[in-house]
Amino acid sequence: MKNQILSGKVIYVVSTGCSKSVEVPPFIKKLESKGAKVYLFATEECQKIIADEEEFENINYRKNNNTKKRNEIEKEDLILIAPCSFNTLNKIAVGIADSYPLTLIHTAIGRNTPIIISAAMNINLWNNFNIKKSLDSISKNKNITMIWPEIKIDSKTKELKSSMVSWNKIEDTIMNKFHIMPFEATCENENNDFNSCKSELYQNFNLYGKAFKEIHVCPDKAGCIAERVENGIAITATGADVGKISPEDIVLIKKVEDEIVYYDGKKKPSSESLLAWNLLKDKPTGVKMVHCHCRKITYSFKNEYCTTKDYFLSNNKDQIEEVENILIKNDYVNLRLHGQVFIGDTFESIIGNIVSKYCSLSEEDDI
């Protein structure tokens, strides 16, 4: 079936002692509807919270956490820890494996299995110095993706509050880990005019990609850069490291019809291709777009005026239109919990704009 995009994937979900744990079953069923085989493992504190939840009986919930039965289930392709409590996050960071779920996690770390951790705790625990140490430790492992909680100002108390991000954000992260595109893409030609070291566009992408990496706005393989060219949109490939772009990482989007992206290139285009197409297709040749991830800008409350209402989904027509509307009055868009989009005539001007926005935020804006 067309929507079985996770077919053949085995996902372990480890849920901890947080109120959000009761929302896990619907999310697991959503993953299963896309073809994944999902197993749930709950910590002792989580088991207390979900003890009376009948919905947990209808999923692969490993109640007894029996290590002797470990071989009865398939080896995981990915582990999702959601929600992840203060206690569990710190135990992961320092290597404590005092329960079956934690043993599964540390075993997976040892064999370099992709792991996603979605933090869920109150603002005071999140600001605890132990969390900052744990985040520093976890960030050294490139196989672990850490999803920070969403932090907002309470409308009634005017105080900061934090909660786990939306399940849409978590699902999006899973898809990215498996390099699954949020849209259908069709390759028409494996080569394009930019797949050469001699290409001026490639040289510019390579040069400025390194610059974006150096100012720390395109971490790991996050972000993309694009440019309006004569016969379409040139964009970096999905999974490309912006700081280490090769000629094969340049993809040409020729057209988008019926939500299908038609492209030339050896690799698939960036997951932000629909956004890039809509923002650049009517622009003059040479106009550029950068999708970056500056954490300080992402979590600053000063940017609410140019921030999307909800977590930004790359294939959502309404949200792409929302981005277009924000850009009418602003020179950039803060995609909620999904980075930023800057448009400019030159990469130099975009870099200057990013640095200007960053410097305009005081240390008090740090979360």
Where are these regions (language model features)?
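A cross-family phosphate/adenosyl-ligand binding-site feature
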Residues: 1-173
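N-terminal entry module detector
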Residues: 143-144, 176-182
